[in-house]
A protein has these predicted regions:
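Glycine-centered signal
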Residues: 14-15, 31-35
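Carbohydrate-active catalytic/glycan-binding domains of CAZyme proteins
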Residues: 36-238
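Compositionally biased, intrinsically disordered low-complexity regions
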Residues: 12, 28, 234-235
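N-terminal secretory signal peptides that target proteins for export/translocation
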Residues: 1-17
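Compositionally biased, low-complexity segments
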Residues: 8, 26-28, 229
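Bacterial N-terminal signal peptides
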Residues: 19-31
Length: 238
């Protein structure tokens, strides 16, 4: 689980039907004795993204259009807006804008492996704001019908030590891949080719860690495995 004073990603143990249960990490737990509780109500969300803070409210997006929002991190309701439909989005604040990544995919077991990961920007996540307007989606990664990879389950990471922006993608039946994006445009860096960094992981995510000798790692949402690297651009190890 990624967490800091702005956002964290929730990892559900059940992929087919994910409901968002937020355990009061919004304020960052300072004591292990704090008792975690489920959020109020029963809003449904599939493949929830990182939770992003925008103008005092919290937003998360899921597969299909839309998502949830909350004023306190406990009580959630529908109303977040994300066009493009697609699957398994992620959201990251960069400067004063929000970058959203999502996938348009053939669907693995139910279809083929043809897919795209797209990115788009918005100045705000509040659909009632006059500044609310998504930019045109841009394809930043793709997979073909017969590839051992599906361009799905995007995970964004802005390296706080270098300012470089990374995107991981892939799923349970093939390679997990990594590409570098331009943090100013959201496009893939010119000449940057995908790198295979893992295999057969479900819905991975890139997470920054400040331990002694590990700066980043790639982790499955289902917490079955993780791999680590001193930097996203170098080899990962189990």
């Amino acid at each position: 689980m990624k967490q800091n004073n702005v956002f964290f990603r929730y990892f559900s143990p059940v992929a087919a039907q994910q409901k968002l249960y937020v355990a009061a990490l919004v304020a960052l737990l300072s004591s292990s004795a704090y008792k975690a509780e489920a959020q109020v109500g029963e809003p449904f969300i599939h493949d929830p993204s990182t939770i992003a803070l925008c103008d005092g409210k919290y937003y998360t997006f899921g597969t299909g259009e839309g998502g949830l929002w909350s004023e306190d991190g406990w009580t959630w309701q529908g109303g977040a807006v994300r066009p493009g439909r697609g699957a398994a989005p992620d959201v990251l604040k960069i400067g004063d804008r929000y970058l959203v990544a999502y996938s348009a995919t053939g669907g693995g077991l139910g279809g083929n492996h043809r897919g795209d990961v797209l990115t788009m920007w918005n100045k705000t996540l509040d659909p009632k704001s006059p500044d609310f307007k998504y930019t045109k989606p841009i394809v930043v990664a793709s997979s073909l019908d017969d590839e051992d990879c599906d361009a799905i389950d995007a995970g964004l990471l802005l390296d706080p030590t270098t300012g470089r922006l990374w995107l991981s993608y892939g799923t349970y039946f093939g390679f997990i891949r990594l590409v570098e994006l331009d943090p100013k445009t959201g496009k893939r860096m010119e000449g940057n080719e995908p790198v295979n960094i893992a295999i057969d992981c479900e819905a991975t995510d890139l997470i920054y860690r400040t331990t002694k000798d590990i700066s980043t790692f790639l982790q499955s949402k289902f917490l079955r495995n993780h791999i680590i690297a001193n930097h996203p651009s170098v080899a990962f190890e189990h």
